[in-house]
Amino acid sequence: MVDFSLKKHGVSSWGRGSLSRKESSAGDSSSTFKSSRYQDMKVSDPELPKVSAKERSKAGTMMKRRLSVHQSNNFGAVKMDFDNMPALPSSAADYSFASNVGNATQTSLITEDQLPDRNTSLASLNTNTRRPDQELYSSKSLRQILSNPDFKAKKFITEKLGDATAVDIDQFTSNLNDLSLEIQDEIKFNIDKSFKEILIVNKGLETATTELKVLRTKVQEMKDIMNQFVTIAEKKLQAEQAANETADLNRTSSSASLSNHSLLPPLKPTPSATRKDRTSVYILERMWNEELMTLFKNVDGAHKYITSTPGRHILLESDNWIEINPATLKPLQKVRLFILNDVVLIAAPKPSKQTELTVSRFSPLRDVTVEVQSEHELSFNFSNKQHTLYRHRDPQVFSKVIDIIRQAKDALREISQAEEDTTRKIRNSYTLLQQERTPNRDATTSPVKVHGRQRSYGGTGTPSRHRSDAQNDALLTNITRSIHVRMGSEETTEVTKRLKRLDDALEDLDLEIGRQNFDLAITKLNHIQSSLKSLYSSATFDESVMVELLSLKCSQRKTILYTKLTNLLACETSDMTKLKSYMLNLVALNEPVDALEVFLQNRSNFINDLTLQIGIIDNVTSFITQVAIIRFQTLKKVTQQYLEVSKNLKRDYTSLLVCWCSEEVDKHFQLMERELSNSSTLSVQAIKITRKQIDELKPVGMDYVYKLDDFIRRNNNRIL
């Protein structure tokens, strides 16, 4: 501890100290005054010792303790005795003057000539022993000095701190320590800032890496799609080029045939030109197969239930569904729904590995009944009488799953209906072919016999033949050509020219029949028949034979038209516009009875098909209600259709319609009695709905309320 107090020193001691200093200064006046105590030191620049930050901090703390003054809590103002204190020199001149006076009183060895030199030495001492500038003590100045690349520590200490006091050195050390702490704080701050920036950059790099991976996948998919587009475009260009070549070839052949008057038909296009481009179908099937392969990879055991059949594909994959216990309504497990176009697969996590999926439920879509239990719950009823309940929080996903399942069921229903229609058409076609191959068959027999219904009226009595239509057609063609050759050798008359034109018109008629332009074909046929009748009276013998042959060919075309129209009328089930058109065409062929009979038989089959689609229902009232609506609404539409067609009829065939409607009503009540035999009672609601449907027939002129009254009278005791 440094004691700065002056109380222990008296005036005498201060004076003696001053005289001793004067004597020493007088004794040394002959020697050169040194401005610095380190002036004569000739030492090479040594390497400064390396002091750690901890030691520098410790040294600074020790210096502070040396220079500290401890004061008590009850410290008061210090009473200083200024009378016993010597007067201090105010400047260098006063100091030199006081020194000269003291030396003069002590010794006479110093002369006045030596005073100027001493004053000069004192002045130089005053100049060299100045304190360092206060600016050196600031952190900013020290930072600039130490950051200079040409900084030399020994030179700086010698020049700036050579004559510094302990207080100045301590202050300088404290400033260095503070600067060191500031630099350490800045280093820590910069490290922390750099670390945060590195974390941000790493996060950005991670995001960029993920996006690049996704982008790479998207780019690869885009390349595949572009390759597919290129393939499709090339196929289309090839098809267009082939079509153009075919058109040029047809044009050339047609021009050649016109120039040569050839009877050969134009050249047909090659199969490659007419073949449809199925590239898009192949691409779609490949995408579906890839989706199925992904399903097999992600769901363990899925390949055991689902096979990669053509056309099978995934419609929807929905996650985050919860299976609920129907009894306790508690969650059981998390599941994922896979809705395919024909099956439903439900996958759940494995007990050992929650990240892997395994098959939990599987069933064909036709055997699954989906019911909405609440806004977020779905109930799946499987064919094996299993009942499961699933819940999802998102209402949009919930609605989407329901819509996809309904659309898939509707598509399956349409496919089944189309398959049934195709099977029915094939069966009817086989039946008609078998009937056509039977010898001694009336050519105009209605196909209603195929369906088990006997005709009530006869047709146009054309003679029966033992040959098939193809043989007859070939025979008539050969005979016609021979007659044409015979008539061509003679003089050509106007009747002969007209007969040739009519023969050519019959050839064109075959094209219209093949294209199913029945209206135009029937119009041409009637025109040809009327023209032949007008030519028969003025024709010669050979020309009359030609007229008879052309009449036979017209009858043959009429038979072909009749067969095609009755077949189409018997097979069509849904399009009422086509049914009406076929009926009108048959009426134009003078076959109104067969047209009406085939149409009525078609509607009977339609009612039976709709009744079978209802299926087995435990509720008798619901079943009777649906059957009544189907049957009586069909009767109403058939009656309205007949009233529209009857405007073109020369006779009234309402009796056929009335008999058919009566039979259908009897079938309905027979069905109700059969249901009564299975069930003990019948509700009044079914009777009311049946009565309402019967009343709707009254506006079209049909009243069968009496049949309902007879049924109620017979089964009054079983109606509740």
From Swiss-Prot:
Coiled-coil ranges from the UniProt annotation: 168-252
Compartment(s) of residence: Cytoplasmic vesicle, Secretory vesicle
Annotated source species: Kluyveromyces lactis (strain ATCC 8585 / CBS 2359 / DSM 70799 / NBRC 1267 / NRRL Y-1140 / WM37)
One record GO biological process: Golgi to plasma membrane transport
Gene Ontology terms: cellular component: exocyst; transport vesicle
Comp. bias intervals (Basic and acidic residues): 37-58
InterPro entries: Cullin_repeat-like_dom_sf, Exo84, Exo84_C, Exo84_C_1, Exo84_C_2, PH-like_dom_sf
Predominant subcellular localization, coarse grouping: cytoplasm
This protein's name: Exocyst complex component EXO84
Key words, A-Z: Coiled coil, Cytoplasmic vesicle, Exocytosis, Isopeptide bond, Protein transport, Transport, Ubl conjugation
Record's function text: Involved in the secretory pathway as part of the exocyst complex which tethers secretory vesicles to the sites of exocytosis. Plays a role in both the assembly of the exocyst and the polarization of this complex to specific sites of the plasma membrane for exocytosis. Also involved in assembly of the spliceosome.
Record region (Disordered): 1-63, 243-275, 434-470
Family to which this protein belongs: Belongs to the EXO84 family.
Gene3D superfamilies listed in its UniProt record: Exo84p, C-terminal helical domain, Exo84p, N-terminal helical domain, Pleckstrin-homology domain (PH domain)/Phosphotyrosine-binding domain (PTB)
Chain positions of cross-link Glycyl lysine isopeptide (Lys-Gly) (interchain with G-Cter in ubiquitin): 188
UniProt biased composition (Polar residues): 26-36, 243-252, 434-447
